Amino acid sequence: NEMFGENKIFESIDNLFDIIDGDRGKNYPKSDELFSEEYCLFLNTKNVTKNGFSFDTKQFITKTKDKLLRKGKLERYDIVLTTRGTVGNVAYYDELIKYKHLRINSGMVILRPKTPNLNQKFIIHVLRNNNYSRVISGSAQPQLPITKLKKILLPFPH
C-alpha cells in the first residue's frame, strides 16, 4: 500500500476486464485427446506459475478439437489467472510467447482488458501480490469463484 501513498483509487476486476471461463462442456478434452505436439497448446496449471508462463511440460489439442471448443481461447495481451488448486498464479500472453494458439483449462480464467490503455505490467504486479486467501472457498481443493473474482478491488495510482 505504501506504493501509492494516499492517492489511490480502487477498481473492481469486473470493471477492468472481461472474465472468460474455459469451455467445460461435452467437448472438454479427455486425456487421450492431449498430445505432446499439435495445433493448440492446452494450458494446465503447471504452465501458469507465480512467475508467469512455464512451458516445461506441454499438452496440445488438434485443430479439430480447438474448433469444437467455444470459449477459453487466448488473444494477445490477455492475462491468465489460476482459480483452482493453486489460486492466484498469473501469466501474461504478450508477443514474447511464441505459441499462436492457446486455450485455458477448467482451473483458470482469462482476464481480457476492457480498455486498451491499461498498464498491464502494473496490473500483473498487483494481481500477483494480491491476497486471495480472503476470497477462496473450499479446503481440499481451494477455488476462486468468478462471482468473488469480479468483486476484487485493485489499487491504482491516482
Tell where the protein language model's regions lie, with residue ranges.
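Structured loops at beta-to-helix junctions and adjacent beta-edge loops in soluble globular domains
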Residues: 16, 45-46, 114, 157
